[in-house]
């Protein structure tokens, strides 16, 4: 039987950030100031594949496992708007926001790439990462079998 949530095989998210402030866009983007796009894409490339995202989810969920397959993970710049585009078979609660927040902190030099890699490769419950605000996050597409 079809279920809108559980029958999905792939989900696509877009997270919009801005490198400047534009008041009319403040409810739909996160103004992050200057960022290093190359660093963001280096971090985004680490996410691809089949990983346990325990470190990047809320821990109130009673889940059998926290593994997700990430098919695409890339940052794209268009003027002052920098979009993070990610697709995967599933996403944990707040996972995209935790990933975006942590990658932005890496870009700002406030978090180490090595720590990020370790959280992906050796997952632990982690309360010391930054969660991006909800503004900017959009579910753009869902694929069904």
Protein language model regions, located:
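Structured-RNA-binding interfaces characteristic of tRNA pseudouridine synthases
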Residues: 1-145
């Amino acid at each position: 039987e079809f279920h809108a949530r559980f029958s999905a095989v792939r989900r696509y998210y877009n997270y919009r950030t801005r490198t400047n402030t534009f008041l009319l866009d403040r409810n739909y983007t996160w103004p992050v100031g200057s960022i290093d796009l190359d660093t963001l894409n280096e971090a985004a490339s680490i996410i691809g594949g089949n990983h346990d995202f325990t470190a990047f989810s809320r821990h109130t969920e009673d889940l059998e496992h926290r593994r997700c397959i990430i098919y695409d993970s890339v940052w794209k710049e268009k003027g002052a708007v920098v979009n993070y585009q990610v697709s995967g078979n599933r996403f944990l609660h707040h996972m995209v926001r935790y990933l975006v927040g942590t990658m932005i902190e890496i870009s700002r030099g406030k978090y180490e790439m090595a720590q990020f890699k370790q959280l992906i490769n050796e997952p632990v419950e982690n309360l010391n990462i930054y969660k991006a605000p909800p503004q900017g996050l959009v579910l753009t597409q869902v694929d069904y079998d």
